[in-house]
Amino acid sequence: MMKSDEGVSGNSNNNNNYKFKDNTFRKYGVEVVAYDNNNNNNNNNNNNDDNNTVTVNSRGFHISIHPFSFRNKLTINQNNGSIGGSSSSSSTSNSVSTPKPQSFYVDDAGIAKQLNQSVFDILSRSRYLSSLSHENLAEFIAAEPSQKHHDQMLIVSEDYKNSLEKQIEIQAKRQTPIPSNTIGRYAYQILKALSYLHSQDLTHRSLSLDNIKLDDNNQIKLTNYGLYYLSDHGENVSFPIGNLLYLSPESILRGAKGSSNTKADVWALGCILLHICLGYCIWQDNNPSIVTNRILHLSGYSTTQSFNSISKSFEQCELKKTIINEKQHEEYEEYDDDEDISEEEKEKRIKDIKLNNRDNMNNFINSLKREEKENSDSNSGSSNSNIGIGLNGLGKELIEIIEQCLIPNPMDRPDSETLLDHPYFNEYKNIDPYQLQWIIKPFTKSWDLPDSLESLTLKEIESYGHIGSDNNGGGGGGGGESDSDIYSGKEIYYFWKLLGGNIEKELVNKGFAKASPSVHKLPLYVPVKASLTESTNSGLNSPQPYQHQHHQHQHQHQHPNIIKSKNSTVYNNEFCLVELSNVFLKIKESFKLYGSKVFEEGIEQSNNNNNNRFNNIENNIELQIIIIREFHKLLYQYQYDDPTLSQPKIYRLAKLFVPPILRGDIWSSILGVNEREAKQLYNSINLDVKGPNDKQFELDIPRCHQYHPLLSSRQGHVQLFKILKAWSLLNLEKGCYWQGLDNVASPFLVHHFFNEPIAFASLKAFVDKYLSILYVPNNHAALSEIMLIYQQLLAYHDPELLNHLMDIQLDPNLYSIPWFITVFAHILPIDKLEILWDSILLCPSSLPNFIAASMIIQFRDSILKMNFEDGITMMSMIPSVDVHKCVSDALSMFNKTPLSTTVTKFVSNTDQELWWMQEVPFEKRKLELFPRIDIHDLINDQQKVILDIRTPLQFQQIHYPSSINVNPKLSKLQQQMEQYKGQQIVVIAPKDQGVDFTNQLIQWKFPFVSMLNGGMDSLEHGAHSLLIISNKN
Amino acid sequence: MNNNNKIFQFKLVLLGEAAVGKSSLVLRFVRGHFLDYQESTIGAAFLAQTVCLNDTTVKFEIWDTAGQERYHTLAPMYYRGAQAAIVVYDIRSEDSFERAIKWVKELQRQGSPNIVIALAGNKLDLAAKRKVETAEAQQYAEENGLLFMETSAKTSQNVNELFVEIAKKLPKTPTTRPGSGRVAIAPIDNGNTGKKNKCCN
């Protein structure tokens, strides 16, 4: 009977298919390996098409969509019959003492709904879940609000077809129970995942057989672990979370929605392990009331159900005396709610509650064992035989673990970490490649061996060998250079969407999205006079509407105290699996199409001559797949290896394309942020002290980019506050907070949500690079300087527009301050801002000036017709700017503009001789409409018209080759000059002269006009040999 | 006197502490809408709106300024040449009232002579959390010859009324021709020298 099924005995799988990658940015997901067979070609007849073999090792990877309805906390103000956001005393809502303004929208049916905080809060929490990463957790990919049903959220998650539930069915059919060592490995892997979740302050709460998935290598992947956290412990949903069959007694006592702690998951694990080993659920029923009573009975309560150890079954019985009474329940509630009481007090109180009676549970498990024994002795066909391996088939230690999981009192029940330390699991740990993660832990260049290295066994050390080597094994063509990567679930989902995937359509196609107005969506079971027991009313007042649709095959009893409502939608435990073969195929094609060499050459070409081999990348999925692979390598190298090597490559690749899915990581690496240093710095700042700007932050944060779901969530406010505060504390001395820094910080927070250190470090680096001269107590001079440069650039490229702006007295002072003081973060919505910043980060820090000019030029045709008032009003239209055009225009302007135009010409303590390098009063410079350039820009570019306006005599003595001597006082000057219009013009003038002449050119709408800084003197000083000097002297 | 159909144009500036609702008041007055979370104003924002009185039309060129103290250096640029000012405070904040009084003093000292100043206690819809008593503000306004109203940009209570009262009080002399309300774009000097800046405390 104890034959081990091949598909089940997972231990042997570990070393073959479970290669642990140590050189890629992503750790878990879909693995792709391309083997280039060119190098050691044994088979000369190889077809060219087969030169490299690409394997996609998906291990049964799927994506599932799981829709759930969240609670619309709609409050109806009964005073005036209108629907309002703030809850008044007569409102139907029983919560919220301080009214918080909410916005509403009215749906097709005319029903006002809240575009509410809960959506934003759910979305912000989803970002926490998607930051988790563990080998036994299915990746949480995203939560997206449904476009169709405004009270529905769609959870997108990694998923697998096979689950423990199915596995048990399969094994039952084959009459081969799941063997003991496999159960042990399941227990080990589930515990690992749980202990990871618990270490992240998360409770699964709905652990059950159907959401413990198995990948194709038969490894555990927990799913659906996010719902409890996402819904704020069930607050945001109108259905109870958790499968009653695996619900812990304390969770039941706390009511359907009461919060659970992590110990509840341990109970669930116990039930599940027992289920696997017995082959049936220990509660032997599906009626919520009966199951509840049975759970509580085994936990030491006297209920209407009791376990008869002689008949070895649960029996209905007369309730003699109710142990749970109102008082005790209240105590329990108090324990939950009162946060002020001390830990000891809590412990004392919980001890009062009679959960510490373990007799019934022990009795129960012992009779199970006895029953098994009797059955096998008599060999009689019991109804439950042959489905599970049975308790006696399990090792003693595993039974002990199960018994510990099922300790009724949560205070006595061990936590997941303690259980994981049980010696029973040592044999699994020893062969677990993920246990060795510390070797390649992030942030360590070398192997970070633990102190206890001596204690490692030979076997353990041997097993490391499997980890470092990547190139052997795998399912590929063998030999040759391999090119591999792992794509995370988020990336697979991104590719799927690029290929036209749409979760809403997918749900409709698979029949998931049944349209029904949300007002009809009442809970399936409405507790009328909910009580714990049927015969008395002394039970709990909390509703117990547990019913799960996935158990429909079993008969559902109607609880007398629960009314079933019509047209209802209860929590649906169904998951819509998405077919991904098109994505995997695309990845294969991409790897074949762009081998490493092909891709390298392509980048070279497109970088060198701007040709369009790699154009339109946004729609080129193959290329994006490869670009992401490249970024994975580079970003990994940047964080954990040599940043100086990879940063230039990241620049180069990012200029080509910044994949939105990696934008945050790319930005921070371009800004020079190192994860470890960022964490050290951030953690060294004490945020508990009172900061100088705290009050201002509190005023500004709640109105910063509030259209954005993450930034308007409570979590977003908290995190933004911490980042801003950390920045202001760090810059106490020199820097200071200007309103607008909140806007600047926002994009970084959005990309590094729940990762404050990186968001903070990125903000810091960004401010240091672009804004340090502005974020000082007095920034007036710096700001004026920037606006002057902007105005001169505008004159250089669009003199007509500048002239008009000056005519209508629309000074940059009046509209451009928020542009420059926030690098456009204040005026643009985040999605547009990101496009701008992609280029700004990759270009010299003068680019914002060009962006500003190209931005206003986009509106030139309108502005030229406008007066002051319309013009200034027009500036509020700037957010509608086409950012892509803006960027490409700015870049082409940048390429056409001499570099020195935007560079400050002053050098302090210069020689009196070098008068052109000395500071000129701002008031004087402000009169110059044109930029000044340095001699390098004059010499390096021959395509310029050089107008020398010195006297003919001076010109004769010395002049620059091919320069033209012009008399600025000429009567028909404009006609004379007309021939040069449109060419780059540089004016060489005597000291302190030429401003009027050059300004005149701009007023005549001559573009590309500049003046040589220092005139002939600087030429003589710096480029004497180039000048043409008359010999007469 | 025949002012029929005549349009008079005035420059009006809003001053007051951060987040007291300056922008919200202007947006309620000009566009008739209200946002719960109005982005903070950086630098200043410009909007225009006309008010019809019995026999004349008054056009306001409104400069809505940044409230954060740091942007104080910019304020003179906007109130210079203004014929009217609304100094706003939040009725729930005594600090903002104190700040309003400082603004009034600055305007009286450095603003245009004969400038019409209105004091507005905003967020009247949140009167339950009031900290500044109406009588107190009323008395201060009377002593200083200010117009005074408590307003709510959210419910629009007293918003139009406030602007109408200002329009009524402004002198309709032939010299106030359209366009005279243009901003004087002379950058302020006190920030320029970089030596001693009285504005940043």
UniProtKB/Swiss-Prot annotation, chain A:
Cytoplasm among keywords: no
Binding site for ATP: Q78, N79, N80, G81, S82, I83, G84, G85, S86, K113
Alphabetic keyword roster: ATP-binding, Nucleotide-binding
Regions of compositional bias (Low complexity) in chain numbering: 36-52, 81-97
Protein kinase domain boundaries: 72-425
Family: Belongs to the protein kinase superfamily. Ser/Thr protein kinase family.
Domain notes from UniProt: The protein kinase domain is predicted to be catalytically inactive.
Protein name (database record): TBC domain-containing protein kinase-like protein
Organism whose genome encodes this protein: Dictyostelium discoideum
Curated annotation (Swiss-Prot), chain B:
Zinc listed as a keyword: no
TM segment ranges: none
Pfam families given in the database record: Ras
Binding site for GTP: 16-24, 35-41, 64-68, 122-125, 152-154
Highest taxon listed in the record's lineage: Eukaryota
Functional summary from the UniProt entry: Required for the fusion of plasma membranes and early endosomes.
Sequence similarity: Belongs to the small GTPase superfamily. Rab family.
Protein name: Ras-related protein Rab-5A
Gene: rab5A
